[in-house]
């Protein structure tokens, strides 16, 4: 026999929330960088997106294994056939970037049939090459964006009161920074000798003092 509380729950129109979290995958919205936002695939996880873009989600060493890219043999063969150029294209080109890596084009003299030059291919083929090309283009865009939006570091300018203090220290002790450091009347904040040296050097440069 069910309890009174259970009977009330069964009669209630409000159903029990059996699934509090609809999707455990966090819906990530990229707002900080427009290039990453434009190339972000919401169907992939954070790790997969970063790998696709040629970035790393974590700078430290990986604690576990890597996710394997599982494909059928027919898919691999179809991708290789689509990415690999035809023999006729290789015979007509002299650009190493258009010849697959591991192959070469031999150019012979039409009269003597002697080998005049050998062009070794540098083009990477296969699905890995496509992802590498895509990620490298994104990285190039990110580098250009970072260079364009980089903030110029502003040099700190000492105040009039600080200039007056440095002038008093220099007049009293010259370039003896150890004495400046132990001067309890002027060096009330106990600045180190190295810090005083840097401040005095900048002060000298700003006021043309030798």
UniProtKB/Swiss-Prot annotation:
InterPro entries: Ribosome_biogenesis_Nop16. It comes from the Eukaryota. The keyword Nucleus applies. The keyword Transcription does not apply. GO terms for biological process: ribosomal large subunit biogenesis; rRNA processing. It is found in: Nucleus, Nucleolus. Keywords: Nucleus, Ribonucleoprotein, Ribosome biogenesis, rRNA processing. One of its GO terms (cellular component) is preribosome, large subunit precursor. Residues 1-27 are annotated as: Disordered. Component of the pre-66S ribosomal particle. Belongs to the NOP16 family. Involved in the biogenesis of the 60S ribosomal subunit. This is Nucleolar protein 16. It comes from Debaryomyces hansenii (strain ATCC 36239 / CBS 767 / BCRC 21394 / JCM 1990 / NBRC 0083 / IGC 2968) (Yeast). The lineage of its organism: Eukaryota, Fungi, Dikarya, Ascomycota, Saccharomycotina.
